[in-house]
């Protein structure tokens, strides 16, 4: 059973690249054709790369690794938070702070500050040592820290792999990952540099539907890796499965039973819709 089908990718617009004037020549080998001034990505190749990325993520997690989900553009924020949370992995979906990986010691101090503020009862003015104005300022500080660092509150070490949506926008994350030798799994749109990514997935990184589909696939790989990790622990008679892992297992089994239905008919890349659907317009940053 494939982790994703050609039909799913076509239906979610994974094949739409950027306008032909906005491209990286290094992506030429991943382009199927050009239609109405838009590059069409070769989804047959994408399927193969998805399988490789899926296996890499699954194996990494099965051996105890952590996957950091990164996507701060509007089209990716919801999917990044939702899927990372579903599988208990850290994520960054609002703003990448410089040094988030390379200067983690400083970032961890900000995380400690956030946790400290979360202990404050902002509704109990009389019982606190702060004035109303001070509590208001502290609440704003807490909310700002939670937006930026809430997704990595439990990250204690360098992640084993990083899933990135839009490597051009997340160039700071890419640079830091490369400095630390952390492999990158990422969607490669036609304007990206494939040399920056260890496990590329040629596809549309501007469409909410495309980003959601591919991020879900990566999260599914994490889920499968967690199951494999737990099975290994069970054989070694180690600690029992955590509650969230048990829920994840139940969801995974339910999904497998649903997928047992006849597989959707695959369509070759050449059968991409003739009309060129416009990508979701990038939201203002």
Swiss-Prot record:
It comes from the Bacteria. Residues 229-285 are annotated as: Disordered. GO terms for cellular component: cytosolic small ribosomal subunit. The keyword Ribonucleoprotein applies. GO terms for biological process: translation. Residues 243-257, 276-285 have a biased composition (Basic and acidic residues). Disulfide bonds: none annotated. Keywords: Ribonucleoprotein, Ribosomal protein. InterPro entries: Ribosomal_uS2, Ribosomal_uS2_bac/mit/plastid, Ribosomal_uS2_flav_dom_sf. GO terms for molecular function: structural constituent of ribosome. Residues 260-275 have a biased composition (Low complexity). Belongs to the universal ribosomal protein uS2 family. This is Small ribosomal subunit protein uS2. It comes from Kocuria rhizophila (strain ATCC 9341 / DSM 348 / NBRC 103217 / DC2201).
């Amino acid at each position: 059973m494939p982790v994703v089908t050609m039909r799913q990718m076509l239906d979610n617009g994974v094949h739409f690249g950027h306008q032909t004037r906005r491209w990286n020549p290094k992506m030429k080998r991943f382009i199927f054709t050009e239609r109405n001034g838009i590059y069409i990505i070769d989804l047959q190749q994408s399927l193969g790369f998805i399988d490789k990325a899926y296996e890499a993520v699954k194996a990494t997690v099965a051996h105890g690794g952590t996957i950091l989900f990164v996507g701060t553009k509007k089209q990716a924020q919801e999917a990044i938070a939702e899927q990372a949370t579903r599988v208990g992995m850290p994520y960054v979906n609002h703003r990448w702070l410089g040094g988030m990986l390379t200067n983690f010691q400083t970032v961890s101090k900000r995380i400690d500050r956030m946790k400290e503020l979360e202990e404050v009862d902002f509704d109990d003015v009389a019982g606190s040592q702060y004035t109303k104005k001070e509590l208001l300022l502290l609440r704003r500080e807490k909310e700002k820290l939670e937006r930026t660092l809430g997704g990595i509150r439990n990250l204690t070490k360098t992640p084993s792999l990083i899933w990135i949506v839009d490597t051009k926008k997340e160039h700071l994350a890419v640079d830091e990952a490369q400095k630390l030798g952390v492999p990158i799994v990422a969607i490669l749109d036609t304007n990206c540099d494939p040399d920056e990514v260890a496990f590329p997935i040629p596809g549309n990184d501007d469409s909410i539907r495309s980003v959601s589909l591919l991020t879900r696939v990566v999260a599914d790989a994490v889920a499968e890796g967690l199951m494999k990790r737990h099975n290994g622990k069970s054989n070694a008679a180690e600690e029992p499965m955590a509650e969230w892992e048990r829920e994840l297992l139940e969801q995974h089994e339910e999904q497998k039973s649903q997928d047992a239905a006849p597989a959707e008919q695959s369509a070759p890349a050449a059968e991409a819709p003739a009309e060129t659907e416009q990508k979701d317009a990038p939201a203002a940053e």
